[in-house]
Amino acid sequence: MKSSGSARATRRNAVSSSSAPAHAEPPARRAAKPARKLDGAAARPLAPTNAASAKPQGRTREDKDRPLFEDIRYLGRLLGDVVREQEGDAVFDVVETIRQTAVKFRREDDKAAAQTLEKMLRKLTPEQTVSVVRAFSYFSHLANIAEDRHHNRRRRIHALAGSAAQAGTVAYALDKLKQAGDASSKTIKQFFEGALIVPVLTAHPTEVQRKSILDAQHDIARLLAERDQPLTARELAHNEALLRARVTTLWQTRMLRDARLTVADEIENALSYYRATFLDELPALYADIEEALAEHGLRARVPAFFQMGSWIGGDRDGNPNVTAATLDEAISRQAAVIFEHYLEQVHKLGAELSVSNLLVGASDALKALAAASPDQSPHRVDEPYRRALIGVYTRLAASARVRLGEGTVPVRSAGRGAAPVRATPYADAEEFAADLRVLTDSLALHHGESLATPRLAPLMRAAEVFGFHLASIDLRQSSDIHEAVVAELLARGGVEADYAALPEADKLRVLLAALADPRPLRSPYLDYSDLAKSELGVLERAHAIRAQFGARAVRNYIISHTETVSDLVEVLLLQKETGLFEGTLGTPHANARNGLMVIPLFETIADLRNASDIMRAFFALPGVGELLAHQGHEQEVMLGYSDSNKDGGFLTSNWELYRAELALVDLFDERGIKLRLFHGRGGTVGRGGGPTYQAILSQPPGTVNGQIRLTEQGEVIASKFANPEIGRRNLETVVAATLEATLAPHSNAPKQLPAFEAAMQTLSDAAMASYRALVYETPGFTDYFFSSTPITEIAELNIGSRPASRKLQDPKNRKIEDLRAIPWGFSWGQCRLLLTGWYGFGSAVAAYLDGAPDAAERGKRVALLKKMNKTWPFFANLLSNMDMVLAKTDLAVASRYAQLVADKKLRKHVFERIVAEWHRTADALAEITGAHARLAANPLLARSIKNRFPYLDPLNHLQVELIKRHRAGDTNARLRRGIHLTINGIAAGLRNTG
């Protein structure tokens, strides 16, 4: 962070020499004409303007990345200026000294630097500490903006140069399939007709950024992008002034909310990404897909196969703050956002479509739509499109009013005529889309197709995708809660006194009898527990929401901790009691159907192993076949990555997920049922995170089949979707990977697959034994974990709407088993060990190779592992993700966290085991891949880490110091705030490691 305010500051680099090549001088960007150079501010042309120079010869990676280094330096200098201006020289100098000392500690594992750093941090006042934390946190955010800008810049340069389509795009997928002979027009058409892709946004306790911060960062990204265009000296100076103002705004804006987060905050946070990205970029993605298809000879309008989902407001698992009221608030706020978008777009269309029937004709349907409009203006008599749009606008406004209440959505004057509230509301979004189609068809018939492209076509696509609900809200609750409510209903109804105590077979007998009986269990004359009333209230509200906003608004019910068939049937019974289940189950001609699909979530290793058996038994129940028929012979199954990882470790979790998927595919194929997998992936590799493209392509053969749902966890939503261009790219990646995985499943089925799978099973068994030996069988490990990570502070600070577990507040009784998977993985990321993404692999490979009877057999086993990496996407993706995690670990920084463990013997024993396993894992990875340097195969990520981590390390050192003070009894509010800031800053710096 270099300030330009003094000679002393000029000698300091905004980015340490570890962060950028020595030749990357502070930017001197060219203006449009050779004017005076501004201090680091001249504009840079985006790309060569002629074809000859569009493909420069001999450019190195450093040449290509020079604009990125310049941007990072430039933003760092602006931030340095602001810190000096706002906080003074003393704070600025402290920030710089801490950075330099931390870099020395990182590079050289310098013990003297560590002692100097510790003394320096100990001397900081609470006020200084917060300022220093904010400085490094904001630099992480600014570096992320620069990286995103560079990704967009490189893609645009590729496009301008006419380069081949890049991996992860639909165009690339189509080219690849065509070359393999898998891309006939009929095949592609069938894929899109049967496809369903749904990213599902979830909340996360540490990554709910304030809208004020997001808005400022969005402006900074936009202004930074402007600097790639030729600018005059005056324009450049104006741009820098605006950038400086927005960085100052960031500095003077609270990073954190004052009050504890509520579900409402989480809802609003998610909605900000719809406004910033999804509302515009998802329709644009559809247009890109259709353009790519047209280039391959398939001119067709694809169905609305890509939709959005959400858990926010509907996920009750472990969060009693999610109720019928929050579900209602979630759908109401979602609907308000989409109605506002529709109304604004229709209003703008009214201004743009000034087409006169004196000059060009219109279809009869369009004329009828115009005639039905309340508009009476004599000035628009010959403008049927405008008149029709006024009618559409008034009906939309009325639709919002009847669903959300008067004044919820801003409504403009629709011109002369009837007030919007008097119009007939649309029955549903399909009716609204049908009116838009009338306009589109009429324009197409009368030489006006180009008029629909800019706004009308995206609006019609939005109506098809978002409906009146914006995103489908999933309901989720734990199976033990369902059992408690069902037991209460059965007991109060005099059916079964102690349902919970029954063996599984008897539970099913009781449940099926209740579902075959048209009479409800619930009585209006009986009182029920608060739990029962709350759970049933959520389902009743879901029933009302479906009637109000359409069946897509709430259509799935996820059952956490599914361990038995009765866990699924209980939710069918709860639907019956709340109007969501029609008919009677298992009786002839009863036309039984459930409104919400019951979706099991298999989470632990044991549950994954039992998944196919549970589903087989469920399908065999009387009447379930009829329910499946009403679902289009489709059934969704959710797989949990987080809990299986906490249970069995990284390698075993991935392997058992793979095996469970294959077993489910075999069962569903046997029964003629279409399987849709819902992947509960987190941000961390330990929670199933990592690059989405490779993750989907590495799925077992036959498991994607055109349909996939996957969670977009709250801790990575900002990095993936805050920038619209990056957001569209991430959305397209999911489509491209699903297309490839569906139509070329053989790419993940190499010839030696049986031998590969046998080796994986051996590795998995050894890895799980190693992992569990550390986590669950090492005496004192629980104390080590709670002392050496910020897990206690995360719990005490009550970050997020989900309350902290009371069990974790009692040191005598807390267990790893009681810890939720998200804070488990998150805490290991904060202390820079990221243990959940690699531990056990080194021991597993060592055991596998050492188990060979002789050197020749050992050589064969090494060769097999190398072949697995080269030809089996599943294994290659697993190693690639592990490589990324190992690159992000820092044993030197982690050793500082280990010092928080008071018991020296325990500290030494556990930390040395972790360090030894890290080296075993790194050695095993090197032997298999042949690469001894981290991320040798991923220079872009290696560069990213190199740029960012010198500014991340100080946040870790500060966090350790603040935790020490906090645990020593310091109750200063600024100290607690500082800890929270470091948590957010480290998460931002690690990006996909939340």
UniProtKB/Swiss-Prot annotation:
- Gene Ontology cellular component? cytosol
**Pfam families reported for this sequence:** PEPcase
Enzyme class comes to: lyase
Whether Endoplasmic reticulum counts among this entry's keywords is no
Write down the SUPFAM superfamilies for this protein, in alphabetical order. Phosphoenolpyruvate/pyruvate domain (SSF51621)
The active-site annotation reads 204, 646
Molecular function (Gene Ontology), one example:
magnesium ion binding
Region ranges (Disordered): 1-66
Which cofactors go with this protein?
Mg(2+)
Q: Which UniProt keywords apply?
A: Carbon dioxide fixation, Lyase, Magnesium
Reaction catalysed by this enzyme? oxaloacetate + phosphate = phosphoenolpyruvate + hydrogencarbonate
| PROSITE patterns, A to Z | PEPCASE_1, PEPCASE_2
Q: Name one GO biological process term.
A: oxaloacetate metabolic process
Q: What is its EC number?
A: 4.1.1.31
Low complexity composition bias: residue spans: 14-25, 41-54
Cite the HAMAP family for this sequence: PEPcase_type1 (MF_00595)
Can you tell me which family this protein belongs to? Belongs to the PEPCase type 1 family.
The role this protein plays is:
Forms oxaloacetate, a four-carbon dicarboxylic acid source for the tricarboxylic acid cycle.
**Alphabetized NCBIfam families for the sequence:** PRK00009.1
Please identify the protein, giving its name as recorded. Phosphoenolpyruvate carboxylase
Gene behind the chain: ppc
